[in-house]
Regions:
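N-terminal hydrophobic/helix-forming segments and targeting peptides
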Residues: 1-262
């Protein structure tokens, strides 16, 4: 989908051995800054690791998933998008002690129903089956991390500035260790690198005042510019330029420092 949309506007489009889609859009002039902007195409999900029979599969989570919220979630499995549900022992069959404990993935199963074992196999991947919905000014969907970044990067390729050589990296395997971005950076050898991704909104009542101050992002508050995270400390000159550019264009935003990635 991404290749089809960006190819007419790009000077070069290629896919590397890892699966990254690497797009070059050259500016006008010589010796222009080489700016790589990355957004990841992968999403969190699951991998089937054991067939328990009767369409029931044990699975491992892939990426940063809150396992407390998995029971009862609908999923789709494999290239054929086989529908399934994540199930566990019925609540009325559990002991009071069991009800106090958080269910980990080892206690959950993906259930494809009778005959499901003939439709899927160990090694197949699964994702959430959530459908996009509009809720007033907001949208509800799975994988907005990082479909929002991918959408914005597509728009940047289609309306690229002419004063830089734009190196757009639509990457893979971000959710399991930033692997795609590392490979793309070695390929492009950019002078400047920027990642477009999502970040939590800390504007809910269960965050106390101190935590809201530390993580000051919130919905409708504009983009967040990371000062540091668990993998990098941003170049001060680049941060300053981003902040000043946003102010000059009247774009509200936030600066943020985070001790780890996710």
């Amino acid at each position: 989908i991404v290749r089809e949309v960006v190819s007419p506007a790009a000077d070069q489009v290629e896919t590397d051995a890892l699966g990254n889609l690497l797009v070059t859009k050259r500016g006008k002039g010589e010796n222009l800054p080489r700016v790589m902007i990355a957004a990841h195409m992968d999403e969190v999900g699951f991998m089937l690791i054991r067939d328990d029979g009767d369409g029931i599969f044990q699975f491992e989570v892939v990426g940063g998933i809150d396992e407390r919220q998995l029971a009862g979630k609908s999923v789709i499995v494999g290239r054929q998008h086989i529908p399934g549900v994540i199930g566990t022992k019925a609540i009325h069959l559990t002991t009071p002690e069991e009800r106090k404990r958080t269910l980990g993935s080892e206690q959950l199963r993906i259930d494809l129903g009778p005959g499901g074992s003939s439709l899927a196999k160990v090694g197949d991947r699964a994702t959430f089956a959530t459908q996009l919905k509009v809720a007033g000014p907001s949208i509800l969907s799975k994988a907005l991390d990082d479909r929002l970044g991918v959408f914005n990067l597509i728009q940047l390729v289609l309306h690229a500035p002419e004063n830089v050589d734009l190196l757009a990296a639509f990457t893979v395997q971000e959710e399991v260790g930033l692997r795609g971005a590392k490979v793309a950076a070695y390929h492009f050898d950019p002078q400047i690198g920027i990642a477009l991704d999502s970040t939590p909104a800390h504007d809910l009542p269960h965050f106390d005042g101190e935590e809201n101050y530390r993580y000051n992002t919130h919905l409708d508050g504009g983009p967040a510019i990371y000062l540091m995270d668990g993998a990098t400390i941003a170049d001060r000159r680049l941060v300053r330029w981003l902040v000043e550019s946003a102010q000059a264009e009247g774009i509200q935003g936030r600066s943020r420092a985070r001790h780890r990635t996710g």
